[in-house]
């Protein structure tokens, strides 16, 4: 096959090099963006008088036919044509003849691929943002049902203070909200049109770059041709944002794995989101949660691949940049798959309220409330802390809990204790007393849910 760049060469490319060099096996997914960009470029060439308007129309019409053929499965791609750009151009030329060879006027594959990736990533960011918003809405729905479901809050994976399941779920809602904001920020920097930068130094033709940007829905035009063809910061930013999404999913999945175990027994996952063992008949495994947790490493690896690829590249374009796509595509695919399966797994899990409440009543999660009670009675906090610590030790030695001690026993640790102490250390009331903004009290949680729903409605 004659290469589109073959004029300077006297020998055919070695078959091993063709296979090694070709990217069509993975960049084929960019075909829609490549064709859309080429149609806008062709129309601009005609509008600017760089090629006759009738030829521009013929090229644009031919590209529409190529798109239809690809989507109908009537057109195939070849390794010999190297990449999606040259495959599309050859398919176009086969349809419209020699005029198709004018499409690449004032354009390089360097600015062409930068355009394709940016268009692709903008669309994918929009899709992932939609999935994040759906997940936040599901979390809010679940939280609203569990404002009174008391459970232990943990530090160091040891029971610390009582909270509610609703409050716990809202913590993740905050994380996914930040993820959404990071993606929006990344999209803003992705929304820059590089076409017209040429190979690296622009072109002598009178291009109307602003027209192309408008046709393709870009907010801005790249201001430096060297940067336009070599910039992959936006891909790194996306992979970093995707990594944080995966961190948040992984943390949640770790808790789901723990909570579904017999040792915690806080939840039971639906059969549809669990698997069994080929040997042990009794097993019900949280494989979906474990897989999401495991896939976190893939996206971290994609981020590292992009950073490592870029770290030693001189300006402007280098073939190393071909390696950006598989890492970027994998990060996109992995995050989308994980978000798609995580939401229904969460929505269908059974919450064991009594077991959560029982766990909250154990582990002295009301110890801080007893200390606060003594502070309100006039004891300095440090002294209150020490007194309650001794009370906890007393309970541990006797297999008791604080709320099961008699008034006389409690007064051994502070004479300030009165009969109202039992109200202060009741687990449900401990939660209800934390009415501070952002706290776990049911009223505070419902207010947080209301604000979160409002934010979801306001964001486009």
Curated annotation (Swiss-Prot):
GO cellular component: cytosol
BP-aspect Gene Ontology terms: arginine biosynthetic process via ornithine; L-arginine biosynthetic process
CDD domains reported in the protein's UniProt record: Argininosuccinate_lyase (cd01359)
InterPro entries: Arg_succ_lyase_C, Argininosuccinate_lyase, Fumarase/histidase_N, Fumarate_lyase_CS, Fumarate_lyase_fam, Fumarate_lyase_N, L-Aspartase-like
Annotated metabolic or biological route of this protein: Amino-acid biosynthesis; L-arginine biosynthesis; L-arginine from L-ornithine and carbamoyl phosphate: step 3/3
Catalytic activities: 2-(N(omega)-L-arginino)succinate = fumarate + L-arginine
Gene3D superfamilies with a match to the protein in the record: Fumarase/aspartase (C-terminal domain), Fumarase/aspartase (Central domain), Fumarase/aspartase (N-terminal domain)
EC number: 4.3.2.1
Keyword set includes Cell wall biogenesis/degradation: no
Enzyme class: lyase
PROSITE patterns xref list: FUMARATE_LYASES
Principal subcellular localisation of the protein: cytoplasm
GO molecular function list: argininosuccinate lyase activity
Location relative to the cell: Cytoplasm
Keywords: Amino-acid biosynthesis, Arginine biosynthesis, Cytoplasm, Lyase
PANTHER family, alphabetized: ARGININOSUCCINATE LYASE
Similarity remark: Belongs to the lyase 1 family. Argininosuccinate lyase subfamily.
NCBIfam families recorded: argH
Protein name as catalogued: Argininosuccinate lyase
Protein source organism: Pelotomaculum thermopropionicum (strain DSM 13744 / JCM 10971 / SI)
């Amino acid at each position: 096959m004659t290469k589109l760049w073959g004029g300077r060469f006297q020998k055919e490319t070695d078959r091993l090099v063709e296979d090694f060099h070709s990217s069509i096996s993975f960049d084929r997914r960019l075909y829609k963006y490549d064709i859309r960009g080429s149609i806008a470029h062709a129309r601009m060439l005609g509008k600017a008088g760089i090629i006759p308007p009738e030829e521009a129309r013929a090229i644009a019409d031919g590209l529409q036919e190529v798109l239809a053929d690809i989507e109908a499965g009537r057109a195939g791609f070849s390794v010999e044509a190297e990449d999606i750009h040259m495959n599309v151009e050859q398919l176009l030329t086969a349809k419209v003849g020699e005029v198709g060879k004018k499409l690449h006027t004032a354009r390089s594959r360097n600015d062409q691929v930068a355009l394709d990736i940016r268009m692709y990533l903008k669309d994918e960011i929009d899709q992932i943002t939609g999935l994040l918003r759906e997940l936040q809405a599901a979390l809010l729905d679940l939280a609203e049902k569990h404002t009174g479901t008391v459970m232990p809050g943990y530090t160091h994976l040891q029971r610390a203070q009582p909270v509610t399941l609703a409050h716990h779920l809202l913590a993740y809602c905050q994380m996914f909200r930040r993820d959404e904001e990071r993606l929006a920020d990344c999209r803003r920097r992705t929304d820059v049109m590089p076409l017209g930068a040429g190979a690296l130094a622009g072109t002598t033709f009178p291009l109307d770059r602003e027209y192309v940007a408008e046709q393709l829905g870009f907010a801005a035009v790249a201001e430096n041709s060297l940067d336009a063809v070599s910039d992959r910061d936006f891909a790194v930013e996306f992979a970093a944002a995707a990594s944080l999404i995966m961190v948040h999913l992984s943390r949640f999945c770790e808790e789901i794995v723990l909570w579904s175990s017999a040792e915690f027994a806080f939840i039971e996952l639906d059969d549809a989101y669990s698997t069994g063992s080929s040997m042990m008949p009794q097993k019900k495994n949280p494989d979906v949660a474990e897989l999401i947790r495991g896939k976190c490493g893939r996206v971290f690896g994609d981020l590292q691949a992009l950073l490592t690829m870029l770290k030693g590249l001189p300006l402007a374009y280098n073939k190393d940049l071909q390696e950006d796509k598989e890492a970027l595509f994998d990060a996109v695919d992995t995050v989308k798959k994980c978000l798609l399966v995580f939401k229904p797994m969460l929505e269908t899990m059974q919450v064991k309220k009594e077991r959560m409440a029982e766990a909250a009543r154990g582990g002295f999660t009301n110890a801080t409330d007893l200390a606060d009670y003594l502070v309100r009675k006039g004891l300095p906090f440090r002294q209150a802390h020490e007194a309650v610590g001794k009370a906890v030790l007393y309970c541990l030695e006797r297999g008791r809990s604080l709320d099961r001690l008699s008034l006389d026993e409690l007064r051994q640790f502070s004479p300030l204790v009165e009969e109202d102490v039992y109200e202060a250390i009741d687990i449900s009331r401990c939660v209800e007393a934390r009415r501070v903004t952002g706290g776990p009290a049911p009223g505070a949680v419902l207010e947080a849910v209301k604000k979160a729903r409002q934010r979801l409605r306001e964001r486009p």
